Amino acid sequence: MKSSVVDRNSSKSEIAEKECRKKTFKSSPWKNPKLIIGATVLCVLVFCTLIGQFIWDKTLVNVGSSPLNLPPVGFEYRKQIGTWAHPLGTDNSGRDLLTLILVGLPHSLGIGFVAASIGLVIGILFGFSAGYLGGRVDDVIRLLSDTTMNIPALLILIIVQSVIPNADFFVMALLLSLFAWQSPTRVLRAQILSMKHSDYVKLAQLSGASDNEIMFKEMMPNLLPFLIAQLTAGTSYSVLVLVGVEVLGLGSQSKPSLGITLNNAINSSAILRGMWWWWGIPTIILMVVFMSLLLISVGLDEVSNPRLRNQ
């Protein structure tokens, strides 16, 4: 009799625990629809481009490797019909457009991600120092941030690219990172200013923890959504500036990219000639990338801000 009662109670407690776990999982802020959609689209796009480089012939990116001016599959252009050998068509130099995208998209995203990562590291150091230490340190960092933020990144990069026309991957990432640290610095400074008066920070100070321990062990874990959001926004900004420079014809021609592809299409009057796939498909890919990064950033803002979640 007692064993049956115990079994009933244990089964009830197990059911209650399962229901509690389900409710917790459903109410988790990380199940934000915008965040999930944006991350899924971006991951699928990156995964397809990376896998495609192993299963697709990368030599088709070379000039003259394919027939000229082929339209995509299912279309006809000047009595030429698209084939599955070149499903997205070719340009007027005989380069396969699918190969240009498979090689160019990871290259552009890689530069943007590295630039944003460097900018985020600088932003963490400056933002934490300005917000937590305050005083002269805060004044100097704010002045430096406000001054450099007003400098147009595109103009500076145009000047630099005219001097260094064939800047490689890491040089370009370093140049872009010079304009990617200001936003995380300002955001993190504001967050640290509001957090440093919280109870757990005061408790850590009373326990004898150093400033570095308080900033990077106590505060930083609570800022993870903000950090990822800033990294995402920085990547989007860096890729946008990079594409802008390349579309103007000032990017490095040594490696295919979406910006260089658009520049070649513009210079060859692809729009007037009716070669819509040459400029249209890379533009759509870029729009999808920017929209997915925007959804990730907005979703992370809602994860870290309960007021936005409840609206």
Which positions does each model-derived feature cover?
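Gly/Trp-centered helix-boundary motif
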Residues: M1-L120, I124, F128-S129, R136, ...
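Alpha-helical membrane-protein architecture signal
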Residues: K22, K26, T90, L98, ...
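Generic hydrophobic transmembrane alpha-helix motif, especially the helices
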Residues: P87, D91, I118-G123, F128-M195, ...
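Transmembrane alpha-helices
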Residues: P106-I122, N212-G244
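Glycine-rich helix-loop "coupling/hinge" segments at transmembrane-helix boundaries
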Residues: M149, S162-V163, I192, V241-I281, ...
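Non-cytoplasmic
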Residues: I158-I159, A173, A180, L227-T261
